[in-house]
Amino acid sequence: MTTLLLMFVVSALPPAASADSPNQVIYSEKTFADGKTRHFTYKTVDGIVIRYFILKSSDGVIRAAFDACDVCWLENKGYSQKGDFVVCNNCGKRFPSARINEVHGGCNPAPLKRNVENGNVIIQVADILDGKRYFNFQGGKR
């Protein structure tokens, strides 16, 4: 099982990010201090590219979510940031940054578990893999 996990690839990491183990991805909390969303990808062994984003919301909390939702995921368009809102690039619905990772379902960005410890944002690879269903288009529309 460890060999399988070592085959995962993390890409699109900002300069301050590091993958310290095959089980977690670590980013410096400072990377998100400006409140702008940072988008990342995680490529699985079977070639599925899982997209997610992290931002520091207007209330000062580091939040993470998959770049997809329960409703629009098949369109594969994700989210963009407009001021203090995260906006669905498919349907145009707007979500306050302070609600990301708290509200789920519908067109809300699907929450991604994260922890902030000792100045680092830590995401477990297993939690990233839980979002694979939003990016697996085999047999789907794409």
Regions found by a protein language model. Name each.
Residues 2-11:
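Bacterial N-terminal signal peptides
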Residues 76-81, 98-100:
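Short Cys/His-rich "knuckle" micro-motifs
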